[in-house]
Amino acid sequence: MLSITPEIIKEIVQGEYHDVFAVLGPHAQKNGYVIRAFFPAAKTLQVKSKLDGSVLAEAVMRNEEGFFEANCNCSEKPSYYFTVGYGDKEFDVEDMYRFGSTIPEGDLYLFGEGTYEQAYRLFGAHPTEVDGVPGCRFTVWAPNAKTVAVVGDFNFWQGRAHVMRKHIPSGIWELFIPYLGEGALYKYEIRNHSGDCLPHKADPYGFAAQKPPEQASVVSVLDRYEWNDAEWFAKANNWTQRDRPISIYEVHLGSWKRVVEEDNRYLSYKELAADLIPYVKSMGFTHIQLMPISEFPFDGSWGYQPVGLYAPTSRFGSPEDFKYFVDCCHQNDLAVLIDWVPGHFPTDSHGLGLFDGTPLYEHADSRQGFHPDWNTYIYNYGRHEVKSFLMANALFWLEQYHIDGLRVDAVASMLYLDYSRKDGEWLPNSYGGRENLEAIDFLRLVNERVYKRFPHAMMVAEESTAWPGVSSPTSCGGLGFGYKWNMGWMNDSLQYISKEPIHRQYHHHDMTFSLHYAFSENFVLPLSHDEVVHGKRSLLGRMPGDAWQQFANLRAYYAFMWTHPGKKLLFMGGEFAQGMEWNHDTSLSWHQLEIDYHSGIQTLVKSLNRLYTDVPALYKEDCMSSGFEWVEADDRHNSIFAFLRKAKDEKPVLVVANFTPVAREGYRVGVNQPGYYRELLNTDSELFGGSNLGNEGGVHSEEIAWHQRPQSVSINIPALAAVVFQLDS
């Protein structure tokens, strides 16, 4: 048996002893059991029987800081509690050091292998019951720490009273604290291998957090919410497949709408459920995509520098409030996607960086572990425990919060070791290449596990390079995502539409080039938040000309986007052509809807969504070359584009767009089939703020061969407008 020396006692009362369970709690000895305890500032301690409350032993103080030792003459381990005296006050308390470990060995193995899909069931703070005693179990990974303690509002943020048990092979620490429950604030006090105390750390697996700028984790119950979306998941496959319409409304919850009268405060999750969801549904979008929801300290990061990956931000309410928001989305037939950030994490002292005094979650070498552009750490994807942490987090959002998919941020920065680095600032892989092999394996693993457990899910990559097979199955050598953002289309088309119409003829290729690769991946066409910040101006602000031309340009551009192959994504404010750049600190400019031009754009987006979801030819073969056919791709002089959208067993749709301020009357377009071509949408309609030049509802084909087709139609194309036709039955 361990000999308890004054030096060991001194280390315990200072919170520096590495193996407190070897000292504190009950220990068998020759004549019964010795029970040791440490209660800072306590004056007396009695060991009492749980059976009848009788005194089993009067403890002797061995250190005036509050270290006690009691001898119980009993043949079996006693069932006991403590009565602790602090002068004129006494308290009955459980001995937290009498409880054994509750961690299954199998869980430790899976975590160490990097394949633990439910790591959050092991780690973090879990209200539970052990041996009939309610309390909270804390578990954290810190293999190189000398000691780890739980600190919080329950112990005046002093760690020496709640030092944890270390599982030496795995580096995992745990402690069950009796009668500590939901709502308690806590962090981890970690001493590095030299015994130096680090800044208090938030729980990497914390399920709730204080509202910033406060930084503590909050004990939270995971599984209490009663969901009401079973009907939604029964039809889940209806909205994730490539042959379904997907129109995504991207939202920053903190600035969609604010309560100006109440100090410009945020809307809560429940208020957003009442206001945002009906609005998005009325606009005809099928999905809501939330910018990062995981807790983050700095508002200006928009959530892309998260500290609490497992905690929905408390800015808008509790975790259960967020579940309510998702639940309401599903009850209104809206899928929910969230931005997920596994590419990097911030350097905040309470975060993951140098977590146990060593580079634990990040690479030790800054050439691999530090991102110079964002001043953030980069995850060490080759470390199994880090893979378990991140993979389990992806699954956590889908399982615990019923999220329908993840948009993975900054994938390119993960794939390339030399991303945004000069020669000499990066390390090649084992083959001498620039590919981050460990990150590639990690992304494939996550996608495989997500789609295996949640076949209905939607995994989307924000990947800005020409990396092949991003949305191809891993079995075919791909990364395994379901979709990829089409950054090339976005950049080229915005570059084109921002030019004066007279110059567009020289940049015609910007609008046609995307069709050379449109079917190489499963694409989403993104007009995201990144395009309306940092001096880029709003989408409306990019349009050339006077006010009328700006709005007409934007209307035509939206119609081109909604009829172009690929799923759709539009950032909030774009649906009514907000005039100013997006500002995360203020509400959208909703007052602009009082202006007809702005309300006309809103009506157009609503009509485009309705058209898109009602006409299968516009979406069923979005990701197949058979779903698109150029009719006129070379009329650069007039800046006119004409194409067909097609699908098996569906009537084709003819789209003609004019990107000059000159109306083209009697413009002839070749068609394959004779008949009446009904005008489904005209962006120049007065409903949308246009001049109302059109085709009186449709046109009849004529037996005049044109564009290598046996038939043709003569149509009026308004200035800076797009018209959409479909062959009538």
Curated annotation (Swiss-Prot):
**Name the UniProt record assigns to this protein:** 1,4-alpha-glucan branching enzyme GlgB
Q: What is its EC number?
A: 2.4.1.18
Please name the source species: Saccharophagus degradans (strain 2-40 / ATCC 43961 / DSM 17024)
Keyword line: Carbohydrate metabolism, Glycogen biosynthesis, Glycogen metabolism, Glycosyltransferase, Transferase
Catalytic activity line of the entry: Transfers a segment of a (1->4)-alpha-D-glucan chain to a primary hydroxy group in a similar glucan chain
| Active site per database record | D409, E462
Transmembrane ranges, per UniProt, are none
Q: How does it assemble?
A: Monomer.
Q: Tell me its family.
A: Belongs to the glycosyl hydrolase 13 family. GlgB subfamily.
